[in-house]
């Protein structure tokens, strides 16, 4: 959505790729094998957890959000329509309300 992805935002992310080690870290992370042992440990997390996911996330598909919801015992899942991989930047207002509600109710 070009109304959400501004030139300033593109420049910011580009500058992040220029920082020493960032590009290599990103590529290394993509090359890592799937770590199912660590993932399986989330089933033991009892802390209330808020999951906010963009319905149009092209990097990590929304199906993964439902997998987290299934495996994480004490969670609240919010799916934001019309939002991609960075909900807090693409839909800041829509992202903030569930955070406030979660913090109020999970004390």
Label each PLM-derived region with a short phrase.
Residues 43-46, 71-72:
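Short, conserved loop/helix-junction motifs that constitute active-site signature segments
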Residues 45, 51-53, 57:
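Short beta-strand/loop motif that positions the catalytic acidic residue
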Residues 58-64:
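Conserved alpha/beta-hydrolase "acid-adjacent" motif
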Residues 66-75:
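Active-site-adjacent alpha-helix of alpha/beta-hydrolase-fold enzymes
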Residues 75-107:
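Catalytic active-site module of serine/aspartate enzymes centered on a nucleophile-bearing elbow/loop
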């Amino acid at each position: 959505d070009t109304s959400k992805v501004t030139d300033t935002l593109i420049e910011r992310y580009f500058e992040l790729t220029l920082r020493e080690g960032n590009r290599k870290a990103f590529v290394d992370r993509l090359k890592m094998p799937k770590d199912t042992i660590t993932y399986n440990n989330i089933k033991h997390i009892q802390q209330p957890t808020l999951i906010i996911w963009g319905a149009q996330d092209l990097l990590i598909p929304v199906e993964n959000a439902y997998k987290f919801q299934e495996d994480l015992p004490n969670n609240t899942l919010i799916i934001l329509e019309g939002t991609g991989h960075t909900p807090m930047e693409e839909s800041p207002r829509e992202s903030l309300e569930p955070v406030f509600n979660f913090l109020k109710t999970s004390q």
